[in-house]
Structure formats: C-alpha cells, structure tokens
C-alpha cells in the first residue's frame, strides 16, 4: 500500500513540475547546439577487421585503463537501455506536453551518446568489438 501511495505522490509531484519542465525545456532548446556523433569519432584511426580483409582485435590494442574501459562500457549499456526508460516515462505522460517533448528529445540525445561511445570504442579498437556486442 505504501508503494502505491509513493507512486501516486511521485506522479503528482511530476505533474505539478510540468510548467517548470516546459520553461526549462524551452530555455534548453533556445541555446542547445545541434551535434552529431560522427563529428567526434577519429575515423582516420579505423582499420578493417578480418571479415573485410583486415586484422581481428587483440588485447594489445587496448588504449585505456581497465577502469576507463569499464566506465565507457557501463555508460554504453545505460545508453542502450534507453528504450525501456523512454517507455516508462512515455507511458505515464504520453507524447503531449512538456514531459512528452522532453522524453523524446532526451531519448534522441542519449541515443547519440550511445552511437558516439560505441563508434569510438570500435574505431579506436579500445575494446573487443565481438565481446561488446554479446
């Protein structure tokens, strides 16, 4: 029973915050600079993998510490899990209103983060691309 009351209180709070969300979303849209993941990838460091006549990844190609690699992979997993976050928020608030617009923009932005992280890790051979996809 307490969990249900907590959910109702949270929903009421989020609904009450919608005017603030709308104001801040509009402010963000006015100052945000559009960016694209491909602009931040060092493509000139890329090489084909064995399937295309290149060389498969080897552990010697790692370029970051274990902590940095783990951090980037966990961040990527979080970005890849976005559809479930989007679904939860969109189910509650729908597509209309400030929360609906925010969740759509947030999902797109986080999707770009995921694309940039994955491309960077694979292009620079910082991680085993096969293990990354498993």
Give short role names for the model-derived ranges.
Residues 1-100, 123-134:
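Terminal targeting/low-complexity segments that flank the catalytic cores of oxidoreductases
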Residues 95, 99-111:
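Tryptophan-centric aromatic hotspots in well-structured domains and transmembrane helices
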């Amino acid at each position: 029973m307490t969990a249900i009351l907590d959910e109702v209180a949270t929903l009421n709070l989020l609904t009450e915050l919608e005017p603030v969300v709308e104001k801040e979303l509009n402010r963000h849209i006015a100052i945000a600079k559009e960016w694209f993941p491909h602009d931040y990838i060092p493509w000139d460091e890329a090489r084909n993998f064995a399937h295309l006549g290149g060389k498969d990844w080897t552990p010697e190609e790692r370029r970051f510490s274990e902590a940095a690699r783990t951090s980037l992979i966990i961040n990527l997993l979080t970005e890849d899990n976005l559809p479930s976050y989007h679904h939860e928020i969109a189910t509650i608030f729908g597509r209309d209103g400030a929360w609906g617009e925010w969740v759509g923009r947030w999902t797109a932005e986080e999707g770009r983060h995921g694309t940039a992280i994955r491309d960077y890790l694979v292009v620079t051979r910082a991680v085993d691309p096969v293990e990354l996809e498993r």
